[in-house]
């Protein structure tokens, strides 16, 4: 599929897509046939801070709809600002940074 995908233009989609490609390349370099690699679609979450401690978020999971021959998104939203969401956002960011750049 080229263009017209349901994915937002976000750093999270880029990051998750990169990890999927890396896993597939690693398996192919080990000799695993392409047909044996499981199909994977990215996931997405976006946190937005509404003040210095509270955040809201939206997330999406994607699946292939064989009947319609297209990717479908299933979204979840928490628009109730909370400190717990703010803490989750910080934890999410620290986890990504640790994965990309190594432990601080």
Regions found by a protein language model. Give the residues of each.
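A conserved FAD-binding loop/helix module that cradles the flavin
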Residues: 1-42, 48
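FAD cofactor-binding and catalytic pocket of flavoenzymes
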Residues: 36, 42-47, 54-57, 69, ...
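C-terminal auxiliary extensions adjacent to catalytic cores
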Residues: 57-104
């Amino acid at each position: 599929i080229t263009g017209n995908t349901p994915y937002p233009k976000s750093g999270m989609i880029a990051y998750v897509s990169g990890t999927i490609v890396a896993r597939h390349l690693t398996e192919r370099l080990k000799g695993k046939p392409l047909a044996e690699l499981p199909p994977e679609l990215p996931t997405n979450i976006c946190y937005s801070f509404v003040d210095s401690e509270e955040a809201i978020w939206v997330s999406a999971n994607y699946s292939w709809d064989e009947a319609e021959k297209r990717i479908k998104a299933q979204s979840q939203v928490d628009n109730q600002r909370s400190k717990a969401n703010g803490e989750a956002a910080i934890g999410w960011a620290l986890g990504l940074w640790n994965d990309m750049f190594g432990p601080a």
